[in-house]
Structures are given as structure tokens and as C-alpha cells.
């Protein structure tokens, strides 16, 4: 019993000490880069619209979009709507809507909201867009899409065959956009966006069965047999994470409050990862996938880490902080960091970087500790069991990162001026896996389905994925399926290539310290 309590409280103490060290390193690391210090923290508030207008730094912007941005307009189905007063009340986050000002949101609005028709029922447009405005925006979208395809070819290191490359000569933007709107409407008609109570109850029963088997194995197996109980504990966390992910997308129940409660249970209580924190950051991950801004750095919070650089375009945001010297060894450190400190890192991060205080987060943390005390007290080897479980959870981290880490990065302003579907397709890949193992990926092996249609219930991903592949092939876009092991190898190779550039082109003395 004492060992269990020591383990749990050591983790909490380690959390506080670790955070103190990180804060100290950042505080005493000298004058940081202007660009790096401008990168918003996870608790920072979004800029006012007036500041956001000035922050746009794109080499080529659309004049129509810039005028509409200044007026606080968005384009939906050919009509301009004024959202300037609504921006700061946007449930999905202030910055999410700010970054789409002036853009055509016809597709992204539909797929990001479960009830788009109801939302727009009583909203009146300011005016219809003129043919000249529509043509200018379409022309800019086409330009951005072709630039993204070119960047994909130039900067991808994991392309195994020419079939994986975009074919710009096959791409026609208007036909592409019509096909994807039609596909969305087909999925709606088929009921693929409706949550299933039966599916939820079944998966929750499986989850409870896993942790029950872990406890039973602790009682039945010899005291020295800690691998199976630990693996089952890790699998419990692993699958809890996927259900938290579904809940925080509001894909498990028809009621948003109930989804938030389920996210709290599966995430904060079962997994130990703050569900509300995940929801806030994950919304931005979908809206800002693999993007950055020349002035403020990373825009996709879930693809940012201070200890490694995934893409050469991100090098200017690294170099002068002490912790950045680790990027010189990122190809070596990546897997050890994921496996050794991955679980503790995300538990700490989700608790201490929550954007606003929520009492139920503290309650969830207490429930998590009590639950795991009850579980780990059933074995005489709680520490090895916990360690094995943490190692298993590292697989979850690799699964979540592998879908995007080797894919291209774009300036956010350019990305939002382009086509949402093209952007998501070029920044994503699927995992190729046998049918029997799909459950281990939480459905996210079908990642194109998830990123193109975030509110789609994952029980239908196996149906929607072939339809998406067909449209990608028709329009000359890559649809990449890669084995999990090959993906991990690709990430390590990518880190090795990027760190070479960082060593020669990085900013600040840290970049050259170990070259």
C-alpha cells in the first residue's frame, strides 16, 4: 500500500518540480528570439480583430479577402455574413473564427458543426458576393492549392512511389469542391454524423472489461508477473483516450453537455488527461492543422514541441532557448522521450496549461488518483505495472503524431485562403492495418475521414474512407496509407533531415553548439 501511495504522490510532486524547472529554463535562458517569444502560450488569449488584421503576413494575399477581413465578414454559400460582434463569443474559440475572416467557409463550417442548418436558421447575410469577388477568391484558392501540391512534392521525404504524388494537371477546383460538398450531403443523408448509443455502450463495456481483466490478472498471476496487468492498464488508458477524443468532438451523444461529461470521465478520470484541455487544443488542431505564422510561430498547438522540429519551415522559431539544444539530437531522442516521459508529460501539460480554471478538473484529478490507487493496490508490484502501462500508452502518442508529423506545413493565412479539403488531405495520411487491428487505432487509422469530416462518427470510417480515396484519385490528390512501423521510421528519418538544416541554418548560438 505504501508503495502505491508513494508512486502516486511522487508523480504529483514530479509534476510540480518539472514545471518549476521548465519555467526556470524559459525565464533564465536569456533574450529569446523575437519570433519565438511571440509564440503564444497555451493559456494566451486570442488577439483582438484589429490586431489580427495587422498580423497577417502572407507573401500573396487576396485583396477581396483582406477587405472582407477588415469588415469582419465570412463567405458562406455565396453570401457575406458579418461575424465581427460574434467572434468573441464563438464557442469553438475566438482565434479560430478570427483566422477565417474574409474566407469562404462553406465547407469547413458544415463539417466542423454538427447542426450547421440550425445555427444559420435565423442569421441574415449582409449581401450576396459579386461575381468578381467570387472569381477572385476562387482564383486565389486555386493558386494556393497548386502551391501546396508543389510544396508536397518538394518537401516530402517519405514518398515511396509516384502514385503518392499530387497530379496538378488532373485538379479542377470547382469540380473538386462540388464533389466534396455532394459527398458531405450524402454522408448526412446516410446518418453517418448521428451518434449511436449502442456503439457507445458496447465500447464502454469493452473498456471496463479491460481494466477488470487487469485487476483479475493482478490477483491471479504470481506477484512477479506484472507485464500482463501493466499492458492491460496501458490498453485501458489507450482506449480511454480514443473515447475522450470522440466525446470532445461531441460525437458520442446528441447533447453537448453530456459529451463534455463523458470527455471528463474518459479523459480526466480514466486516462488522467484533462478532457477540457484536449477539447480546446484539438479544435485548433483541426482548424489550424500543420500551420504557422511568420510573426507568432506555431498555430497548431498539438503539433508543437520545444524539443524537436518536424519541418524545415519551423527552424526560425528555434535556437535561443536552452531547451532547444535538444533538437540537435532529435532523431535520437524522439522515441526515448515518447516512451519514457510521454505519459507523464501529457498528464502534466493538460493539467497545468488549462486555459481557464475549472473546479471539476481538480475533482477529476482526485478521482483519477483514487481510481488508480484502488487498481494498483491489488498488486504487490505497483510501480512496474504502472511503468509497463505508461510504455503502452506511448503507442497512442505515436499513433496520434504519425498521421501528420512528416506532412507539409503552411502559413495559416495561405491555408485559410486555399481549399480546406486540399489542405487537410496534403497534411494527413492513413495507417494501413489489418481489419482485426483497426480497433487498436481508435478508428484514427482512417485519418482522412476524421480530418475532412471531424464530426463524423468513427463507426462509419471504414465506409467513408473508400469514397474519399475515389475522389482523391479522380482529382489527382494523394491518398497515402502507410504501415505503422514504416511511419515511425519515416518520422525518425524526417527528424534527422530537419536537424541537419537546423545545425547549419538555425538562429542563435544553441543551433551551433554541437555541430
From Swiss-Prot:
UniProt binding sites for heme: 90, 113
Pathway, per record: Lipid metabolism; sphingolipid metabolism
PROSITE patterns: CYTOCHROME_B5_1 (PS00191), CYTOCHROME_B5_2 (PS50255)
Pfam family, one: Cyt-b5
Transmembrane intervals: 3-23, 198-218, 258-278, 322-342, 359-379, 382-402
Entry keywords, A to Z: Electron transport, Heme, Iron, Lipid metabolism, Membrane, Metal-binding, Oxidoreductase, Sphingolipid metabolism, Transmembrane, Transmembrane helix, Transport
Coiled coil: none
Membrane topology: Multi-pass membrane protein
Residue ranges constituting the Cytochrome b5 heme-binding domain according to the UniProt record: 46-113
Predominant location: membrane
Cellular component annotations (GO), alphabetically ordered: membrane
BP GO terms, sorted: lipid metabolic process; sphingolipid biosynthetic process
Top-rank taxon, per record: Eukaryota
Gene3D superfamilies noted in UniProt: Cytochrome b5-like heme/steroid binding domain
Catalytic activity: a (4E,8E)-4-sphinga-4,8-dienine ceramide + 2 Fe(II)-[cytochrome b5] + O2 + 2 H(+) = an N-acyl-(4E,8E,10E)-sphingatrienine + 2 Fe(III)-[cytochrome b5] + 2 H2O
Subcellular location: Membrane
Requisite cofactors: Fe(2+)
CDD domains in UniProt: Delta6-FADS-like
Presence of keyword Metal-binding: yes
Motif (Histidine box-1): 245-249
Broad class of enzyme this protein falls into: oxidoreductase
Motif Histidine box-2, residue range(s) on this chain: 281-286
InterPro entries (UniProt xref): Cyt_B5-like_heme/steroid-bd (IPR001199), Cyt_B5-like_heme/steroid_sf (IPR036400), Cyt_B5_heme-BS (IPR018506), FA_desaturase_dom (IPR005804), Fatty_acid_desaturase (IPR012171)
Domain characteristics, as noted in the entry: The histidine box domains may contain the active site and/or be involved in metal ion binding.
Function: Fatty acid desaturase that catalyzes the introduction of the third double bond at the Delta(10) position in d18:3Delta4,8,10 triunsaturated sphingolipid long fatty acid chains. The cytochrome b5 domain probably acts as the direct electron donor to the active site of the desaturase.
Name under which the protein is recorded: Sphingolipid 10-desaturase
Organism: Thalassiosira pseudonana
Gene: desA
